Amino acid sequence: MLQQRAFVIRYAAVLALLLPVSVLPAQATYGTEAQAKAMLNRAVAAMKQDKTKALAMFNKGEGGFRDRDLYVFCANAVDGTLTAHPYLKGEHLQDIKGKKGYPLGREIMQKAATGKIKEVTYWWPRPGSDKPLEKHAFYTKVEGFNCGVGYYKG
């Protein structure tokens, strides 16, 4: 009985090694709505724990705060200065418009509220591209900052 169990275990291990890679699930190329919401929730928790450390992690893309085309952005809730963003750090959020002219930054600055997650839709190119695509960002106010994470539709 013990020998038969050992044989089955060895046989299963060999089969697992021989499985073609294409049968295994691949990570999607782009982030999803659910992943964007989850990243924002983790970002809020990190900000509540230590906002200085959290902002540094967001900027460096550490701690799982940059994944494919998902990233955290944060702006000072008073003056709108982006303190965390992969390439717009130091810009004023209220001045940022989508590629079709929508004032998404102004909306985020005016409507962000502590404890409430809101959504804005605009057109923005994926990192590394010039082609604008429909993008949705979830955002909230936390520890004196308006923070968000966006994902692309389609």
For every predicted segment, state its role.
Residues 2, 10-154:
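N-terminal membrane-sensor/transducer module of prokaryotic signaling receptors
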Residues 7:
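Localized chelating/binding microdomains
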